[in-house]
Amino acid sequence: GEPSIVPAIVSSPSEPNWLRGLGGPLRGFVEYVTATAPSPQPLLALGAGLTAFGAIAGRRYAGPTDLRTNLYCIGIADSGGGKDYPLKSAASLIVEAGMHHVLGGAKIASGPALITSLKKQPNILYTIDEIGFLLSAAANRLRSPKYILEIMDNMTEFYSMSDSKYLGTDYADQEERPREVIEQPCLCMFGVTTPNVFWSSLSSGNVGDGSLARMIILESENNYPD
């Protein structure tokens, strides 16, 4: 008969050295996600855990310098490399903790939509697949419409206002469009994308406007065959 085809066996990556420095629930989450993933991605699991716990702890804790728990993490891995599992795990953690209200939508339609979400829920986690396309559109000031550009602008402003108050924008008709004021906004975001899409989405403008400096970039150390 025809010889059987044996699928390639991909060994699980050994425990990275940085994982030994983690403790508490964060370490437990990263270890669990890495151990149960079909294609383990420890660095992406770290990003998922940091942002999920950051949203849960949002507006409750501050560091000695008043640093807050709002984080933007971008997980980068090849297509089919296991980036979806940490993304779903971050959302699952929020749901299993009974904090559905902390979980934002799978997509952000506009800058004003982001403001509305944080007005309703000041500590919130967005888990966004293929975030590279969103970042590319939000950074393209020559071609993208204003409501898309405002996504990145608002993300940058919310990040800086996490220890104070977001004062919003005054409009001419303040009865129809009242100013949105948000006390100590804690916006957390974990997105995943592929290397080509992410790096091609960046420009010198991202460095100049400070948006890139507010992101923790976690590029996979583990590649898996398709």
Language model segments and positions:
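Phosphate-handling catalytic cores of nucleic-acid transaction enzymes
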Residues: 1-226
